[in-house]
Structures are given as C-alpha cells and as structure tokens.
C-alpha cells in the first residue's frame, strides 16, 4: 500500500506528552539510584529479575555487554513535534524552542530508568543542548555529537574511559524518498551511511566503551507532523511513488532496506572492535489508515523508549516485527542464554534470508488424454450446454494470487515477489503449454488451441501481456468493481474476439487481503460488504457480457497460513508475512481475534454461497456464475519431516509458487466438471496434479441448472407444431400457439420456499419465481418442471416466464406479478400492472399474441379472515375476484385464463400441526394465524372450513356464470386439480414433509413439480372430466394433445354446458358472527352501545319504509305495504329467510321490540312511516313515535336503548320536478332537524340512523322495457318523463346532491353531541347509488317492485345489509355506495376490538365533551368528518372504476358497472 502521510501519524513518537513535560535535565542527585519509576511507567509491569542476570565484573567486550554494565545513556538527533500551526505569537514560538531537548530527554530518561533497574548506579541521561541555529542534516548531527562528547568528558560522575555508555543516534532518510519501491536499496543505504559516517567515525574515535543504537525514524519523519532536525539532507518534495506503492511493495521494500543496513553494518569497521559497536534499530509500523483517521496519535515518549528497548533484546535478523500503534508490547528481558545486548557478532548467523538460493524451481506440467476434445456440433446458445472446446476466450479478476506475484521467483529472492508472473497464473496464465505449465488456460488450450485472453510473461494488469487477466496485486473485494469495468471495456474493444458470439470463461477469486485486514476495519471488511462488492462486480459482468461462464472461487481458508508462520524450523521472512497479513498472524491461537477470523472466513464462504444460490445470475440462458469451492478447506502441505512445505510458496511464504499454481489450476478444472452440490471442497496440495476428463455422457461444464435433474420431466409428445395459421378463437388454441405466459396470485405463485434448503427458515422470504409451477422458467424441462418449461417444448420463443429470484417489480419476474401475502382484494392491482407491462413490452404483440394467464388466490385471505371477518367475507372474495377477472376480460385480447383453486386449509393444518418437531409451531401465528391457530373441533375451525367452501363456490360460480365466455378470443377455465390433495404418509404414520418448504406451509420444488404436471393435465382434460384431486406421490405423466383433440380445453370444445344455478328460495342471510352477547351491564353511553344492548327499534319515512310493493300482487289490486319485510323495521320470519335490520338484531337480542310484521296496520309496531311523506312530515312522525313509545307498557322509556332509522327524500325530489320554485334544500334539512330535535328532547338512550336520500335519477336510469313506460307514467313523480340528458334531469341531480350534503352535516351539529345517551349518525350507503346489473350487464329488475319505482323484497334485503354494515363502519370511513349483488354472507360482524355501533366520538373524530370547546366542536368536526367522507368516496370510485358526481358540476349520467 502507499505510504500516505496520515498513515504514519503513529503513537510511538509524539514525545511532548505528560512524561516529557516532567523531565528535568539536571537535579540535585546525578544518579538514578533511589529514583522513582517514572510517572509514565508507574502502571507498567517490570517482569525482569536483575539479580539473576547481574555480574560482579563489568564486561570488557561490547559483544557481551549486559544492561547492568551500562552507566550512562545519551542521545543525539532531534526527536520533536513540529510547532503548532496556531502558535503565531512570539511567546508560543519561544516555548517550542525547548521541545527538541525535552523530547530527547523523554526517551532517554525512560531508557535510563529501565537500565537503572539492572544498574542502580547509572547516571542521569543526557541530551546535549542545542543553542545554535540548526543547519540541517548531517551537520547538525555532528555538532550534537561533539557537544555530547564534551559533556561526557566534563561529567565528574562518569568515568569516561572505563564506564559503558549507551548512545542513541536518531536519524531519518526522508530526503531519499524512502521507501519508494526499488530493488537497489543498497544504494539508498550507502547514501545514508555516507551522511552518518562523520558522526559515527567521531564517536568511534572519541568515545571508548560505547554501544550505539542507530535508530531509523524514516517512516515517521517522512509523513508525520514531526520535524526531524537530524534528517540526512534538506527535505525534498514528496515523491510520487508514495501514492502508488502497494502494501506488498512497501513490505518488501522495508525488508530489503533493513537487510541492506544490516549487511552493511555487519561488515563495517564499526563492528570490528571490542569496545565499540553500532547496531541498526529499525522502526517499521503496522498501521490502519482508518484507525488513525478516527483517533489522534498518542502523545507518550514511553512508547518509543519501550519499543527501542525491546528491539535491543532481539537478535540481528529477527528485528522484524512491525510496531503497532494499537498495542503496547510487554517489556522484554535478557535471557539466561543471551543476557547481553545483541550485536552483529553475538547474534550468530543472520536468520534473515538475504540472497537468492538454489535454482529456479522446476515447473510442474501434466498431460491430458481425454477422448473427446471436440466442440459442440453447433455453437451452443445455452451456458448449460457448454463443452470445454466451446470456450474461445478466457479472463480473470482478483488479487496478487491471480496476478501471479512471485510464482516464478527463485527461492530466497524475496524482492522478486514484486514481479507478477501472469503467464504462470493458475486461472488464466498461458506460458508455454500444459506439458510444462499447468494452468486453466493451458488445459483449455488442449481443447481449443485458438483460445484467446490468457496472460503471458510478466507485468502489471495494464501491460499487453496481461491480456484479459485484470487482477490487481493487493486488491480487495471492492477492487473487483473497477476490474470488471476494465475487463468489459477490453473485451468490447479487442478485435481478436467476437464479443457477442464467443463463449467466455472468467474466473473471479478474491478475499485474502480482506481477511488480512479484517481486524483493523471490521466494518469495511464485513461479510456483508465483502459479498455486496462481489455482487456488484458480478452484476457488471452479468449486465455487460454475453455468453459467459463465470467461476467464483470461494475464499481461501487463509487461517492455515499460521502453521507456516509459527514453525520456526522453516525459513520464512516473518516480518513480511506478519506485515502482509497481520489479522491472521499476529494473534495467539486461542485468542478471540482468531476465533473471530475463523468465523469471518466461514461467513465469507457462506454469504458467497447464498449470493450465487439466489439465482441472481441465472436469469439469462447465456450467462451463469458457478461457485467453485475447492479452496473451502485447505490443509497446509507438509514435507516428509512433517514440516510445512514452503516449496508451495513464493520466497515471501505468502504467495503461491508455480507448484501451488499448478495444483490450484487442476483443482479449479475438476471443480468445473463436478455437478453442483457434489463439488470437491477440499484441496490436497500434496497429491499429484490430476486432470479429470469431461463425462462422455454429460460433457458439459456443470452449472446450477444442468446439475439438477431430479425435478425434470419427460414430454413424450411428438406433434408439437402450432396451428397452420394463428387461431382467432380461444376454443381452437394449441399449446404451440401460446406465445406469452403470465401469473397472478400470492406467495405460492411468487415462489416462496420453493428452493429453500431443508431447515433453512431464514430463507423464508426468498421468492423463487423461476421455479414457480405456473410461471417459472428456470432451467429447462429436463431438470425443472413448470408450465412454461412444458410450453417451451412446443414453442421455444415463449415469453413472460419468470426466472431466478426477486419480487414482482424486478425484471426477473417478467409477467409473474404474484405478490407474497396477496389477498383477493390485491388482484385488481396485479391485473393493472400485468396489463401495463404487456402493453409496454416491445417483445410482446399485445393484440395478436395468445396468452395463458394463471390465477390462484385465496389462501392468504383465509390466513387472515379471523382478524376481520367482514373484510375477508365470501362476498368480498367473490367481488374482488370478479373485478379482477372482469378487468382481464375487458383489457386483454387473446387470452386463456386458468383459474386454479387454492390449497385447502385442512392440508396446511395436517402438515404443520402433525409435525411439531420439524415445523416452526412457534411461528404459526405469523405464518397463517387463522388457519393454524384454531383448535380441533372448535367453532373457529368450523367457520374456517365453511368460509373455504364458500370461497371455492365463488370460483365455480364466477366461471359457470358464463360472463367470461362472451368473446371468441377469451375464456376462463376452472382447473380443479388442487381441490383435493392426498398427502403422503411415512411408514411410521407421520405425514411426509419433504414436499414442503421449511415453514411447512409453502410447497417446495418437489411439490411444485407435481403441481405443474397436474395443471398441464387439467388443461388438456375436457370440462366435466377434469381431475379434481392430486396425489403428491403419484407418477403423473405429461399427457399430449391428440390428433382428434389437439386444443387446450374450454367449455365449448369440451361440448360442455354449465350447470344451471338453483333458484333462490329466499333473500335471507347467513349469520357468521361469534360475539352475540350484549354488554355486561347496560351501558350509560351511546358511544359504548353494542348491538345486543338494543331493546327497541323504530322507523320514520315514506313508502320505502312501508315496503310498498315488496312482493308481487294482482295488478288490479291496490299496492300492499309489506311492513314485515321492510329493510329498517320489518320483523317477519328470521334472518335466514328475511334480511331486515330487526332480524339481524334478533341474533343479538331475541327480545327486541318495535319491529313490524305482516301487512296490517295493527302489526305495524313502531313503524310510523306514511306513504307519500316528505321531509316536512318528519316532525309529526317523530312526535307520533314518541307518543307510541310513551304509551307502550312493554317499553321502559328511560332505560331501554332505542334504535330509530329515518329515511326520507324521494318524494321531496319528485316534488321538485313538479314545482322547482317551491322546493328548497334548506327547508328539507330544517324539517329533518326539527324531527331530530323532537327525538333529542323526548327520547333518552337513543341511537338515530339518518339514511341519506338515494340518487333518484341514477338508480332508475336505463331500466328500459316495461319500466321505461311505467316510470314515465308515474303520476306522483313526474321526474321520469324527462330524459337523462335533459336540463331538468341535470337540475334534479344537483338538488339530489345538495340534499345529501346538507343531511351529512346534521350528525356533526353541536346540539346532538351534548348528551351522553343520544347520537345521530348519517349512514351514507346511498350517496353513490349504483344500478344493480344482471349477468348480461342490464339493469336487474328483480331488485324493484312491479311499479319499477319501489324496492322488491330482494332490494329491501340489500338495503338492510347496507344499513347494518354502515352502522359497523367508523364515521368518515363508511361505505358510500350500495353493493346490490347476491350473497348470503355479506353481513359484517362487530369487531372484537371495537364491538360498538359507530358514532362520531368512538370513531375518534370527536374529542371528549368535557375537554372540548363547543364552538370548536361545531366547526372543526364537520371539516374533519367531511374530509374523511370525501376520501371514502374517492376510494370507492377509484376501486370500482365508477364516476361519482362532483358537488360543483354533476355529470350527465352515472356509470352502471358494479
């Protein structure tokens, strides 16, 4: 790495810390005896025992000099910090002039203190004062030396001739641009030595008995904030190489620099005497750039002194351990074997390998004797059918192992490791041939001699010899991204290859350098970042390079390098090893750091596995990435003596030699031929190089898709031809005519869990769309059975299938728009997205291409139905599914829609609850609460099963309605294979979970394969003869179209008639609510009123409340009032046969009073409605009602809770048509308010429903036929004689809307919120009145009475349902349109969390009265509620595609679609 300035702001030499400030250059006592251990060392342990090492007689030779022999310590050379940039005033500048002396003294005092433990009589240390103006470099150093000698001579305590002295000479070589990469470090050292010679000569000549430490501070001086006065020459400008030098270059240069100094000094005149020696003490630093940027350097002189002392305790040749700014090493002690300070003479033979030894290692070749070396008969289009001889181009990305650093270096020639022997690189080198050099490229050249892209010779990645070997020495995972970009550009621009057509193999190997630095920056080198960087680089290759097979080699188990580092019997430059890979080598075996390293290696390997297993790079048929795991487990090769065999390594013992490159190449090749899941993960370097031949039966390079054969299926069909010309009818559609596939649905169709490994619950969110039974297109039918893969056997140009993994928005999804967790209500959104995608995709001819769309929904609805039984009711399920299919029918031409049943919840329960030891029972509520949580034989379970049956009935009813068979080019076919599933049972009687994902809820690939076969079989079976059961263990063969029946089956080509729907016997409803009880005590507040608390019902209104004409009558008879069937007050029969509001309330309180029965006035109960009544009649009806209640002996007026429904306005609108000038919207509201005032003043404990007037014109428009005549002839309502487009009708619509608007404001009137036991709530279900339609799209007259104006019994039932559901909806969120479609299950249930009838207050639109200002109430609440009302209207309009009438300018007509 480059020697950036910030890197070397280390903590060992900032000597102006607290210790330096306390040092005195003189004292009253000039010896260290009795002095306290210095402040900076008080807490530092002193482990040495001076008594065991002491000698009574001082040594006569410097080569046997013990610490106890030393009497005096001194130093020359400036060791100081630069003045602060902020020290501008003279006072501050004067302070800095003393810093050199203080800094020097800070170091030598600590050294003296250490020596004082061995030699109590040692004198106080000395740094000569410098009062002269510095002249720089060698001159200053010499002047300090002369001053030092003078001071020592004049010191009366020092016996200058006989006492041993320790002199430290601090210098730096910064002017020499140290340490720029150079193989000629000797020249640099000689230059430095020349500058030091005068000083060293002087000391040797003048100072007897001296041990001189030559302390090199070059790295620090060059780039820190320190100002070194003892630089050997004036500072020069920093050289450019400092920014370009790699970590490897820096380390090797440090080593060679150290070796050069030692070699020079060992043979110099300074080490020939007995009384004088000079020893080079190096300081090379292990540093983390990120750490130094984050923290300021330590300001402690002790650090340098301790490190220098420890260096003195190391033999020459072993002073290799770099200094770490993060940790302070313990103080080292002299040993019994070596109790002296080390010199070049007493260190013995230098252990550092300094010169090349031996001859160039013999390179290992091999031979290939494969019988089949031929390419494919034609150039393959699929990467999964790629033979070795089909490869025409080779490339590689990575670090120095791929660059080939040191691969061809002679043993001992450490500096030559800087040479990148790319031609020998295991994955891409092409030197010579396979007989002499074993590399992947040379192996492939045996199959295709014309291979291009391999590297030859030596050089960096920028040289022409590198070709497509773009590995960069020192690269980490984040360096792969620029490498990928460079490789793509080179390939695109190289005229020797055909970029689009040539098949390429690219090998990616990275991670060693990331692991080596992991401990210094765990965030940068985290497993997540490592994988993300690899993913980004692979994304570039995937996006840019066609026809490519990418090898991603798992990261090397680099921790095994510790064996080589720790074995001292093996000659290796440990300084280099440790510097290159500190995080692997510098910690103890049982340390937490090593445990973390091993775990990180494992995570690197696992995350890369997950990245590739995701299918992210298997989205194209001409590209794949295959993980090659042969480096996952590596044993250190050993010699016959059992020692680590360094012949497999370059001279630095870190990089591979050509021998290791050969073994790696053969291991990679063999991995490439081994099936995924069966690849060798252990590489034995000690064995012979072995080259495997491709299997003659299966000669392809193994990929994820061609390695999995277990889920494939054989298609026996011989006739796979399309129609002679594209069919125009869906009933004449052959499989080969299908050009587009698509799918809608939930997690099953999205592919959740299909490809998950057993027991891997963490993979529960991956959407394996490429394996989805109805829309997946991964692999081929040979190994992945899906409907698209079957159809591709008939039409290889099929479009729309999903591949790989990802969500619905990704390109991999294509036309699989299923969304995990989707409910029926989400289908419409999926349809809209699908239609838009089809229209926008240029590959699809939207109008002409035939499409198969598979729809499956319902399971997720059942999973959540118990949370909101209203939202997930069968009626809503039917409506949502119908709306989605209607949209497909309306928008998509030439389509066959498969409507597939959902998996019965009983199946899920059996599997999940029957295997508690395998299934995550604790997660049942999260996975599918309403299906998995109910107990056996419980009411909740029975309700679930009933709802599931209702859902299934909805599927059949929709298809059999024939509404989707009105066009020749569109049909919906129910495929019932999922209706009944036979689960496999193991021999011990337990259910076989091998067909399910780890969550035991979703089917896995084994299950999906069976679903695909069953779906295909259903599509070829005629209606009326379709298989409606699935045996998961059955051998389902793929059937074929026959000559007589070559088409996909529809109702018409099956000669099938849908069964007629049974006649509806009554208009009752099924009651599915569970909480039927009233409140525990009679509530005092209307805002806590539950349905079971209601004791009395009553109604005000006109002939609609009287149920006039609800049942047919003789045309000659006057119309009858069927009060007992009235929607808001009728009580005939029971809810199961007659749906009315009182019959609903009877389910909660069978003793309810006030409802009407029959047709006579005597049984009218509290129904005070009057035929022809208008708003002006409401106050009188209110008074009549109050009087009847007072006079009823059954009613406790004060205590009984009452429910009053007021509905009027139709006659007011009719009156407007007769006399526009005589009608006023204000009067209408005023009359209603007067009636409410009466109720408010007279009735305690009352809940009032005010139902908004219906849209009169919209409800009766386009009735046609006899109704057109009857309505026009209405004498009491002349509105219908006008056309819908007339001015009169437009005015009527305005008035209609104004009446609704005025009425909605009543419930916010301040006077009706003052009492705790009274509430007025406007129920707006008629606000947007929708015309009910029949199956043909015409107005359904069965909702109307014989006069076409009033409602029939069916219409009354629908009004009752709408009113009840409105009452259970919060104010501001109420349904504002009627849904007049038949279903017995549309009634909502009170929510367990909020079981009350909704009022303004419990809808949280009204603050407590005690806290609210009435004036604020009156204005603020209507605004808030109005906004909520508007939102509700807009949501309804958007969801149903309806056009609602704006308040300002009503449209000419209403949409009549449901």
Curated annotation (Swiss-Prot):
Glycans are attached at residues 173, 433, 493, 529, 590, 690, 783, 1077, 1114, 1379. The keyword Transmembrane applies. Residues 1-19 form the signal peptide. Sequence repeats lie at residues 39-347, 362-707, 708-1054, 1064-1403. Its EC number is 3.1.1.5, 3.1.1.4, 3.1.1.3. Residues 1404-1446 are annotated as: Necessary for membrane localization. Residues 20-1415 are extracellular. Belongs to the 'GDSL' lipolytic enzyme family. Phospholipase B1 subfamily. It holds the Pfam family Lipase_GDSL. This is Phospholipase B1, membrane-associated. The active site is at residues 400, 514, 655. Calcium-independent membrane-associated phospholipase that catalyzes complete diacylation of phospholipids by hydrolyzing both sn-1 and sn-2 fatty acyl chains attached to the glycerol backbone (phospholipase B activity). Has dual phospholipase and lysophospholipase activities toward diacylphospholipids. Preferentially cleaves sn-2 ester bonds over sn-1 bonds. Acts as a lipase toward glycerolipid substrates. Hydrolyzes fatty acyl chains of diacylglycerols with preference for the sn-2 position and of triacylglycerols with not positional selectivity. Undergoes proteolytic cleavage in the ileum. It is an enzyme of class 3 (hydrolase). It catalyses: a 1,2-diacyl-sn-glycero-3-phosphocholine + H2O = a 1-acyl-sn-glycero-3-phosphocholine + a fatty acid + H(+); a 1-O-alkyl-2-acyl-sn-glycero-3-phosphocholine + H2O = a 1-O-alkyl-sn-glycero-3-phosphocholine + a fatty acid + H(+); a 1-acyl-sn-glycero-3-phosphocholine + H2O = sn-glycerol 3-phosphocholine + a fatty acid + H(+); a triacylglycerol + H2O = a diacylglycerol + a fatty acid + H(+). GO terms for cellular component: apical plasma membrane. Residues 1437-1458 are cytoplasmic. It is found in: Apical cell membrane. GO terms for molecular function: calcium-independent phospholipase A2 activity; lysophospholipase activity; monoacylglycerol lipase activity; phosphatidyl phospholipase B activity; phospholipase A1 activity; triacylglycerol lipase activity. Keywords: Cell membrane, Glycoprotein, Hydrolase, Lipid metabolism, Membrane, Phospholipid metabolism, Repeat, Signal, Transmembrane, Transmembrane helix. It is a single-pass type I membrane protein. GO terms for biological process: diacylglycerol catabolic process; monoacylglycerol catabolic process; phosphatidylcholine catabolic process. Residues 39-1403 are annotated as: 4 X 308-326 AA approximate repeats. Repeat 2 contains the catalytic domain. Intestine. The chain crosses the membrane at residues 1416-1436.
